[in-house]
């Protein structure tokens, strides 16, 4: 019997495609990467390509473990965080580890639902019925940060109902890392991290996660062999030594976010409170039409229609000069 196949999730970060399409230098506000990343002194070593990576990634896991005070048996790595979302869902939903129902906040990152559905799980509107509760923290696209106290309360609820709290902290280093639960070991908790956003390297696909050893062993078994390529591993080893420098990034982002929010409000648009390097904006008109107008002005923003928000856009915080260009283009489109 034919079964409806899930629809591919939509993402921002289409600047390269737009530049190739229009032959113009488009300013990409759709990709929410760090506009003030640490200076990582790294260059690709071509000799690394002569060997297979260590598929256990022992050195890499030891480096991660030393930062987050976790044993390497509690750490998994993957070709970007999305690979780990996919593998996690495959492991827990298809192997009887959890009930094949999931709960997620709305709006939120589309890959959770897609990955869960690909593993034959179905959504529920009742958190206590879920085998997995997906928490994006800070949330994408709203920028809302769930405080640690509330996250731990959610964890207690999932433990009580014999479920798993999946906490995606891809953006938390650009928000408030003191609210992270990455250092907490609990059989009912899986925490996801990524270098993409914090270090502004979407071309380096590297994600990592934390969970109980039994779950991590299954994820590492289900993951494709050598899925973290030699360049990604090499870059990650260097970048992880620069985590403390992200404090400067957070300060600069906060300053620019406040300026950008005020400038957006001055245009008569509603910007939602955000804790991170992007802002959700209610534009009071069809988002797709506004995005097309902005493209004609060489500005790319994230159309939030795919989030179920057809009159909203998501805007990344960039440098002050770039943010001024955005506001000027936005002003021309809404007035």
Predicted regions and their residues:
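Active-site phosphate-binding strand-loop segment of PLP-dependent enzymes
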Residues: 117-119, 124-175
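N-terminal "arm"/small-domain region of PLP-dependent enzymes with the aminotransferase-like
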Residues: 1-56, 63-66
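Conserved PLP-binding catalytic core of the aspartate aminotransferase-like
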Residues: 266-297
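Short, conserved charged micro-motifs
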Residues: 40, 286-292, 322-325
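PLP-dependent enzyme catalytic core of the Aspartate aminotransferase-like
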Residues: 70, 149, 296-297, 306-335
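Phosphate-binding glycine-rich loop
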Residues: 57-101, 119
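PLP-dependent aminotransferase class I/II
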Residues: 55, 188-265, 269-272
């Amino acid at each position: 019997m034919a079964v409806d196949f899930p629809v591919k999730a939509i993402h921002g970060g289409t600047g390269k495609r737009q530049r190739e399409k229009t032959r113009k230098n488009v300013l990409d506000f759709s990709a929410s990467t760090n506009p003030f990343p640490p200076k990582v002194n790294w260059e690709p070593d071509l000799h690394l390509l002569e060997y297979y990576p260590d598929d256990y990634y022992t050195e890499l896991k030891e480096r991660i473990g030393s930062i987050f005070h976790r044993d390497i048996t509690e750490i998994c790595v993957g070709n970007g965080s999305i690979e780990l979302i996919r593998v996690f869902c495959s492991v827990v939903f298809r192997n009887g580890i959890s009930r094949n129902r999931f709960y997620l906040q709305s709006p939120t990152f589309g890959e959770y639902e897609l990955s869960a559905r690909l593993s034959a799980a179905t959504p529920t509107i009742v958190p206590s019925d879920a085998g997995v509760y997906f928490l994006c923290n800070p949330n994408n696209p709203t920028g809302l940060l769930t405080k640690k106290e509330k996250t731990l309360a959610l964890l207690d609820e999932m433990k009580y109902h014999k479920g798993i709290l999946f906490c995606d902290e891809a953006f938390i280093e650009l928000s408030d890392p003191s609210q992270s639960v990455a250092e907490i070991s609990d059989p009912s908790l899986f925490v996801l991290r990524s270098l993409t956003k914090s270090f502004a390297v979407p071309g380096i696909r590297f994600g990592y996660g934390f969970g109980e050893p039994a779950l991590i062993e299954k994820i590492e078994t289900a993951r494709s062999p050598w899925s973290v390529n030699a360049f990604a591993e090499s870059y990650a080893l260097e970048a992880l030594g620069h985590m403390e420098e992200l404090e400067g990034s957070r300060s600069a982002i906060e300053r620019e976010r406040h300026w950008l929010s005020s400038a957006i409000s001055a245009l008569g648009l509603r910007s939602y409170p955000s804790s991170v390097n992007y802002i959700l904006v209610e534009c009071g008109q069809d988002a797709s039409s506004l995005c097309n107008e902005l493209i004609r002005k060489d500005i790319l923003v994230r159309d939030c229609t795919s989030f179920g928000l057809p009159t909203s856009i998501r805007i990344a915080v960039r440098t002050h000069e770039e943010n001024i260009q955005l506001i000027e283009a936005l002003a021309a489109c809404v007035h």
